[in-house]
Every structure is written in C-alpha cells, then in structure tokens.
Amino acid sequence: MGFGWQGSVSIAFTALAFVVMAADWVGPDVTFTVLLAFLTAFDGQIVTVAKAAAGYGNTGLLTVIFLYWVAEGITQTGGLELIMNFVLGRSRSVHWALARSMFPVMCLSAFLNNTPCVTFMIPILISWGRRCGVPIKKLLIPLSYASVLGGTCTSIGTSTNLVIVGLQDARYTKAKQLDQAKFQIFDIAPYGVPYALWGFVFILLTQAFLLPGNSSRYAKDLLIAVRVLPSSSVAKKKLKDSGLLQQSGFSVSGIYRDGKYLSKPDPNWVLEPNDILYAAGEFDVVEFVGEEFGLGLVNADAETSAERPFTTGEESVFTPTGGAPYQKLVQATIAPTSDLIGRTVREVSWQGRFGLIPVAIQRGNGREDGRLNDVVLAAGDVLILDTTPFYDEEREDSKNNFAGKVRAVKDGAAKEFVVGVKVKKSSEVVNKTVSAAGLRGIPGLFVLSVDRADGSSVEASDYLYKIQPDDTIWIATDIGAVGFLAKFPGLELVQQEQVDKTGTSILYRHLVQAAVSHKGPIVGKTVRDVRFRTLYNAAVVAVHREGARVPLKVQDIVLQGGDVLLISCHTNWADEHRHDKSFVLLQPVPDSSPPKRSRMVIGVLLATGMVLTQIVGGLKSREYIHLWPAAVLTSALMLLTGCMNADQARKAIYWDVYLTIAAAFGVSAALEGTGVAASFANGIISIGKNLHSDGAALIAIYIATAMLSELLTNNAAGAIMYPIAAIAGDALKISPKETSVAIMLGASAGFINPFSYQCNLMVYAAGNYSVREFAIIGAPFQIWLMIVAGFILCYMKEWHQVWIVSWICTAGIVLLPALYFLLPTKVQLRIDAFFDRVAQTLNPKLIIERRNSIRRQASRTGSDGTGSSDSPRALGVPKVITA
C-alpha cells in the first residue's frame, strides 16, 4: 500500500477502535473522540487540529442536532400520538397489524428523524397491539426497521443522510464543483422508496417464520397452569367458543377437574369455574391471556391445594383476583449432577431446600405434557420459580443443583401506585371493555376497578363491562407505566382539579416521587389535613406503601413514614424542597410531562412548514433556506408558542450522537490525508473496472458500509466510508449523488446487531428481545436488502421501471390476504394451522429439539426396558384421560 508510517498508525488504531466498539467495551462517542485526539498528537503529520475540529461545525451535523428540537416539540404536544392512533385503527391479524403500523411509520420517518419517531411509537404500538391481540414482539422489531427504511426515502429522514449531505457539500464546494455539491431532499427517493418497499414486503412475507412471538429473553415454550376464575368470561363456554384457541402463542394442552386430568381436550369441552388449564406458551403471553380472560396463575403449591375440594382457608393460596401471587420470578436450569433428576416436582421440598416455588417448566425434554407437579425432572430442564423470603442464591444446595447463574425474570413486587383516571365524554374508550380499550396487558399496569358515575362500582373481574363517560378507572401502576397513562387520550387524572389549582403551567409541569420521612411533620396526617396543595403548591396524585395497597381516595390517606408520594408539580419543585424535613428522597419521573394538546395543531403546522421549505426548494432546484437554520427557527417558534420548554429542548439533544459524528469526521479526514482512504478506494475502483460496471462498484460501497454499520454506529460508518467512496466514485466518473445514495442506504442497514442502531436498541429493551431473536430476522433481512440494493444500484438510470414494479408487487402482497377474510372461519383456522405447522417445521431450533428429544427417549427406553419415558412415580396421580 502507498502510505507511510502515518497511514499505518491510522489503520492500526482505527482498527483497535473498531474492536473496542464492536465488543461494546466503550461507547463510540468516547472511543472516536479519544482516537481523534490521539491522531492529532503527531504535530499535524496525520491530521491537523483544524481539520480534526472541522467536523464539530459541519452543517449536516448541526442539522441533525437541531432537528431533535423539532421532533421534541411535536412529541410534547401529543399530536402525533393522536394521529397514529387514528391511522392504526383495528386489525384482525399479524399481517394487517404490520401493514397498518409499518407503512405510516415509514411515511412519517421520511420527514421526521427516526429516533424520536420510534420513541413515541413504542408505547402506542404496545397498547394498540394489546387491543388487537397481536404479540408485541411481532410489532416492535418491524417498527425499528420501518423507521430506518422510511428514513432512506428523503435526505432528512435519518441523521446519517444529513451527515452524508454535509460531507458531499463540503467536499465539492471546496473543489469548486458547485453543481455536484448539492443533494436535494428527494434526490434519494427514486432509489430509497423501492428499497423501503421491498424491505416492507420481506417483513410481511416472513413474519410467521422469522419474527419472534410475544416472549421474554428467557425460557420459552413453557408448561404453565392457570385457573378459570368464577367471574371469568370463559366460564360455562365451550373451549372452541371461549376465544382461547385463537390466541397467538397460547395453546391448551390439558385440563384438570375433580381429580382427573384431561389430555388434549376436545374443542367442545365446556369450561367450568375452578378448572385448571395447562397452557403451552411463553410466560408473558400466558399472563396476558390470563388477565384478558379471567384466568389466575397457579404455581406448584396452589396446584397441590387444588387437588382437594376448596375450603375457606385453602382459597387463600390465590390472590383476590384468583391467581397465585409471585414476588420475583427467577429462571434456573437443572444441573447434570443434580439430585433432583428422576424425581417429580411434587417430591422436592422446594421451599425448605431452596426458598423457591415452581411456577412453570420448559416443555419437551423427552416427555409428554401433564400436570406441573407430576413432571419428572431431567438434566437440562429449565424452570421458572418464584422466590420466598428464604431464597438465597448463594446457598450451597442451589449451586449444586442448578447449572450456571440463576437469572431474574420478572419482578412482581415492583413499586406500585394506585392512580384514578376519569373517562372524558369524547374518549375513544367509551363503550369498550377494559381489554378492548387497550388498558390490559400493558407492562406494569393493572386495572383494579371502575367507579360508575351513579356511585356503583364494577370489579376488575367483570371482563364484559363497557366503560361509560365519567367513569373513574382505578389502576395499579408502576412508575414506568405512569407516563403512558398520563398521555393516554381521553383520560384525565382524578386529581386533575387539584393539579390545575396549583397554578403551575402545563409547560413546566411534571411528576416527582417523594419518600415521606419517618420523623417528618406530615406523618400521621391525611393529605387533606396537611393542606398539601396550599403548603407545597403541588398535588398528590398517588401513594405507594411497601407491602400494602393503599385506599383509593388520595385525599383521605393517612401518611406514614416510608410512603412514596407521586406528586404533580413544577419542574423546579424537587430542587426547592431538597432539604425539606418532610421528605428523605425526591426523584423526578423521566418523561412525565403531560402532553400540551392545545398546542398540537401549532406544532404540526410548524414542522410541516419547515419540511415544505425543503420540498419547494428541491422541486425548484433552489435553496431558499438551509435546513439547519430552518430547524432552529422552527424550534424557536415552538418554544415561543408553548409546544415545549427550554429544559425539554436541551434534554432532547443526543450529545453522544453529536460527539460520535463530529469525531468520526475527523478520523475520516485523517484516513483521507494519509492516503489510507485512497488505498481502499483503489480496491473498489478495481472491482468497477474489472467488471466494467459502475453498479458493481456501488454495490461494493454499499456492502462495505453495511458491514461497517453492523460493527459501529450508522453515522460513524457513513463518515468513515464517505471519503473512500468519493475517491472511488470520482475515479470511475460516477455521479457524486449516486455515490452518496449507496452510502446512505448502506449506512442505514444495521439490522442484525441490536446495538448498531439507536432505534434497534430502543425496541430491543422495550420488547425484551434477545440478541439471537434480532439476528434470526436481521441476518436474512440484511441479505435480502443487499440483493435489492444490488438491483437498484445497477439500474439507477431505469428507476422509473423499478418504481412501478416495486409498487405493484407491494400492493399485491399487502392486499391479496384480504381474500382470506372472505373465507369461512373454519377454513381460516385450518389455513392458520397449516402455516403454523410449516413455521414449526422450518424452525431450526424446534428441529434440533425434536431430534434431541427422540434420542433421549430412545436412550431411556434402552436403559430401563419399559419402552416408556414416564417414571412410575408420576403415574396414577391423578388419573389421565385422553379426549
């Protein structure tokens, strides 16, 4: 290679930085900043300080930063949430749910930066998915992908696009090639739109096979017991009419009644109160279905109690809602040397030995489904267990019997507030059940009861009650779900009148958690007696008390030391009362500012006006105003009109993104100045010349950028690759616009690694995905889009034909399933069952599990000569009947 020691140093330390970032040891913002400082330390022989610092003032980067302000202003008004809730409507299948959710997001993210777009869409899709009965995991990865795909349709759709636009402008303006410097807002659309459409098509066609169900990151395909509550909506109904058989990710493998276990029950079986159903599925799904249909979770202890007729005392093993309570669920795997192997679950003294109670066990492992207590334990079995006060992870017995680390799965004892919300007359929840309104199944949120306007009450167990105007819904919620509840359209806090009387402008209002001091002056008094609003100019919205659910009426609660108050107050309130003797801890609740709906129209119009300045300028090939000052002026108007406050604007900026992009600019300047970029560009030039095709060179640029995007962030990948691609493009006489398009598409193609893109990371956490689940859909998606990009880049001159074919194919694939719903229900169920079998047949994990199960069963048969995999101790209790 034709570069000296400067190039060698640049390559070596840049490669080291890639390793550090790929291993996630240090974030890209810090890594690139340190790398850039190091490269400037050679007296300007690698890169001068001036060139290294130039990236911090790049107009493309400044545009990215100030567009965060615009997005924050729109989000704070709640306008986009109302629009998206209207657009989403209702859906009857995963196919239509994806079509309804992905396409609007793609359109929206073409003009609004995809990161804030995903931020406000996550809670909307979670609630909407629950209302439609669609597994949340089927929606959140496509949400991230849709926001990325939509962002490739315009030059302002993603921060990466803006970065590349800025780099192109700076490069060719400096070279006095002004005709090549400008990249208009829709210059990428002829290529980005087909790219997005074919990505959309891939998700629709493969969702049944590649997208995960509504599961956690931990054990899947569990055997879980649930009890039909007396008030359940499925009681006295046939199994086929109950709605349980239509639930995705949930199947009934058996039913226990009157001392008998019925395996594979007939769909005509009539369910009775206190029946125990044995569900095969994933914990989150089963828990949601249980809440939806009135089924209580049954652990091993409760299952034992249910073997005898219920008496008054024995019913206490269930909570008032009918389920066995759990504190903190953990997952454990039976070790190969465990003395539990060969014993049934009922024969183990779980609480005495481990301080644990079995809740569920992973199916398979060479045995048929049965009752939880009758399962014969084997090496490798994965159990979900509840913890008791006597649980100690470091106990020697636990270490000897469980392989590896016992992992926490779910906390059932999280801090809980009881919040009352009143239903407005115009609310969309009116005349809907609690489930249909989207208020069931939301993580951290549980409906307790409904107080009707006439003074009567409806318990949460009444699953058929339809909400009416002026009803008060009492909800138990953890702090994470409070923000969702505060922004739910058509609901307002019961304490809203008290909140309004504080006089605090909605612009500066948020929530704070305040822990009551044990020796404070408000202990032993009610909120009303304290005259809390008058004394503190704040309103108590809810109260949490450890180990107890406090009464619903906030004003009449007698405060105790250790109570945690949820307070609506001014943003400065926590600082002003930091040393107040009434409280020992004050903690603001993130993202708890109420939506400024009265400013919704203003916010949307201002953002639309900003986008129109770029659209009109692009159509007339004239820049009336650069997007950077346009974004700043739009944000200023949003501040003046009360769409957001200054603190919210400051916090909206992702400074790690700024530092990453700016430093990456400097590193790319170092690679270009030392000749490293030119050396790598020669490889791309050789590909183009050897294949006599500009398209081949552009494909090489796309693939190299996409691979780099999986290792780094999308912005860093674009900044590093741009000088390399630009040199190659100039040598091959490729238009700078076409070169930039290849980099823009490639830099956004971070689909396999959830940590490679900010949008991926947000849905990864919200959906509780595993890295493997991302890779299963992301790897084939990446390959598919490489093929699509190859065609698009090779036929850039024929983009009109590519557009027509893409739109026609997309329309056909989206609309063709509409014919499915014209078929009779029985035929639909048969088709669904067929595709479920196909999906299971093609699932590599299930194929391996089936083979291992057959091998284990054959091994056991050979060793005991019985030809059966069941232990004698598991037989006879209870009697098993096959329908």
From Swiss-Prot:
Transmembrane portions of the chain: 3-23, 30-50, 60-80, 106-126, 139-159, 185-205, 600-620, 624-644, 657-677, 693-713, 774-794, 802-822
Compartments where found: Cell membrane
MF terms (GO), sorted A to Z: monoatomic cation transmembrane transporter activity; sulfate transmembrane transporter activity; symporter activity
Example GO biological process: potassium ion transport
Claim: Transmembrane is one of the keywords in the record: yes
Domain RCK C-terminal: 211-295, 317-401, 406-491, 497-583
Segments of skewed composition (Low complexity): 861-871
Annotated segments matching region Disordered: 857-883
UniProt topology in membrane: Multi-pass membrane protein
GO cellular component: plasma membrane
Induction description: Up-regulated by sulfur deprivation.
Disruption phenotype: No effect on sulfate uptake, due to the redundancy with SLT1 and SULTR2. Slt1 and slt2, as well as slt1 and sultr2 double mutants show a 50% decline in uptake while the slt1, slt2 and sultr2 triple mutant exhibits no increase in sulfate uptake capacity when deprived of sulfur. Modified regulation of the SLT3 gene that becomes up-regulated by sulfur deprivation instead of down-regulated as in wild-type.
Pfam families: CitMHS, TrkA_C
Swiss-Prot/TrEMBL keywords: Cell membrane, Membrane, Repeat, Stress response, Sulfate transport, Symport, Transmembrane, Transmembrane helix, Transport
Function: Na(+)/sulfate cotransporter with a probable high-affinity for sulfate and a proteasome dependent turnover.
Family: Belongs to the divalent anion:Na+ symporter (DASS) superfamily. Na+/sulfate symporter (TC 2.A.47.4) family.
This protein's name: Sodium/sulfate cotransporter 2
Species lineage: Eukaryota, Viridiplantae, Chlorophyta, core chlorophytes, Chlorophyceae
